[in-house]
Amino acid sequence: MFDVKTVSLEWGGKTLTLETGRIARQADGAVLATYGETVVLCAVTAAKSVKEGQDFFPLTVHYQEKYSAAGRIPGGFFKRERGATEKETLVSRLIDRPVRPLFPEGFYNEINVIAQVLSYDGETEPDIVAMIAASAALTISGVPFMGPIAAARVGFIEGEYVLNPKQDVALADGRLDLVVAATDTAVMMVESEAKELSEDEMLGAVLFAHDEIKKVIGAIIQLAEKAAKDPWDIDLSDNTADIKKKLKDLVGKDVAAAYKLTDKSARSNALNEARAKAKAAFAEEGAQTQMVAMKTMKKVEADIVRGAILKDGQRIDGRTTTQVRPIEAIVGFLPRTHGSSLFTRGETQAICTTTLGTKDAEQMIDGLEGLRYENFMLHYNFPPYSVGEVGRFGAPGRREVGHGKLAWRALHPVLPTKEEFPYTIRILSDITESNGSSSMATVCGGCLSMMDAGVPVKRPVSGIAMGLILEGDKFAVLSDILGDEDHLGDMDFKVAGTSEGITTMQMDIKVAGITREIFEVALRQASEGRAHILGEMTKALGEARTELSAHAPRIETLQIDKSKIRDVIGTGGKVIREIVATTGAKVDIDDEGLIKISSSDLTQIEAAKNWILGIVEEAEVGKIYKGKVVNIVDFGAFVNFMGGKDGLVHVSEMKNERVEKPTDVVKEGQDVYVKVLEIDQRGKVRLSMRVVDQETGAELEDTRPPREPREPRGDRGDRGDRGDRRGPRGDRGPRREGGDRGPRREGGDRPRRDRDDGPAPDHMPAFLKSDD
């Protein structure tokens, strides 16, 4: 029933198995990839014809994580997988970016690549497995895919490169989380987060990954030899030479003149005029010819721009290849935000704000590994007005999610620990102008806004986007590329970092032939550019502010003994709710006894802190505390102090002079200062008010004269003056001998008095005297 084909190899200490022929047999290509106990199914389908009038390549990649893969049921009301999560969107982009350039120009058939995680072992990251499965499925599908590619994750732990570590382990135990996708001969994509690694260390990691990737590519080729379908028979020959020549003759000079205009709007208008002129020249041709002519027009523009850069080193806006556009940075220009910056580089501009919050503002993330919370968020928005266009404005798309995550990776390594800075941090970046490298503007502006908010970052971070023009043996690396240079170039290479090293690197390469020499030149040139940008940022703000904004919440942390946690929380949360309701501060306590008290009002924090300290601390003899009278009795008043302790102020300790009644001095609910005089063995606390200034709480000198010592009882003489005190027995008469009581009965009871013994004694109640 099944014609199953399988290949396996040992890779990174685990077995990687690629299988086809058992599942999803109606797809053009389907591969089940197993690595460890993580299993990913990837299926590829392709439309057999091109939609009429279509002039682009509609490749769609979907990556989905099934909760059942980890033995979990989705949380929330709807118990099924919903729309793509941020992680699923990012992995979809990871698959798309290295695959898209490997389809031939002019191939416009729609292709769907769907990767689903079916099993997850908690150790092997499924994104790498999905990228390998997608490449294998495309390779055996028969579509004109010029692969295969493969992918690998690299960590840098204790000075050694490690293949395919778990993602969180890579950064917890090491300094690097790097994903590389490549063909057998060329690196196609790099995505990374690093803890200030040097350029050489980053380059070494990329080359290490490429060597390991080649092993997987060999396995994919083996699978294709066993199971690949016949390649599609399509005509992709370039028959546009005549059209291209006609366009160059017609509008070549107009295009060259347009690209010499340094202003983006003026340049765009001039190019649109040239395109309209070209379109008019083919107005009498058929619709297909017109479409081909306009596609060829883009090639004409690319040839003119690329030729000028390679031949003369002349860029679109007149800069040299290493020159960075003018930069202006402003901080604190939004009065009510916790931190803000306006970062402008040429015609790219970002408004960045930083907002500080408490623990309850953390982002809840539900995934295969369970529920977790993230205390650092960065959200990137790209409205259509930023490029002078009319377009959709609403929920973020894949591009916005990807750019935001890139900036997040750049800034995350320099954040303080939760212990150093217990705030939730959210950076919002709104791109207000864009002409290249808006994600790196977000890095620079986001860093400045955090510093303006008082976030103690380790070091400032700057970022730069690099480009590449490659023609044969000639190449030019461009610093701080424009949008047009990005579209017309062969590489988009973004690097961010501090003065000490790289924190993130992202690379998308559109052509083969990127050599180590080109990598080294690009990294060196990027380092120089980052240093220049960092200098410009320092002019606006050199280091993080030492004070938080007046509008930001304050958080104080308090560590208590674990045994005291239940005392602070109370039965059913009664105590902690009372603290919050009374003081107005937020109080969070974790299982380790770390308490976070937060409020925008410092007096509320202080009140809650003192309350908690009163619960967990022991009173000290001789120390003065502020308390509240909670009960008044005849002999004194009970005072509650340290939040949860009561002590007695005896009436004699209220004032130095005599006090008749405690209510003459205090009343219930009154705040008083008390000094601890004594704590007995049972924990009872004796307090004094008279030795404390009730206005200031300062200790007073005890001015009460000491009591005169009593005469010792042994010196009271023979006490003869007291007389004989009513004689030997006074009026009671002589003590009876007891004989008239009679002997006790056997049961120990006295004999009952006989009525004939005489009249009842006078002291007896009347009802006992009665004879009735």
From Swiss-Prot:
Subcellular location as annotated: Cytoplasm
Domain (S1 motif): residue spans on this chain: 622-690
Record field: compositional bias (Basic and acidic residues): 701-760
Residues where Mg(2+) binds: D486, D492
Record key words, sorted: Cytoplasm, Magnesium, Metal-binding, Nucleotidyltransferase, RNA-binding, Transferase
Main subcellular location of this protein, as a coarse class: cytoplasm
GO molecular function: 3'-5'-RNA exonuclease activity; magnesium ion binding; polyribonucleotide nucleotidyltransferase activity; RNA binding
One Gene Ontology cellular component annotation held by this UniProt entry: cytosol
EC class (word): transferase
Protein function: Involved in mRNA degradation. Catalyzes the phosphorolysis of single-stranded polyribonucleotides processively in the 3'- to 5'-direction.
Family that this chain belongs to: Belongs to the polyribonucleotide nucleotidyltransferase family.
Annotated HAMAP family: PNPase (MF_01595)
Protein name: Polyribonucleotide nucleotidyltransferase
Organism of this sequence: Novosphingobium aromaticivorans (strain ATCC 700278 / DSM 12444 / CCUG 56034 / CIP 105152 / NBRC 16084 / F199)
Gene: pnp
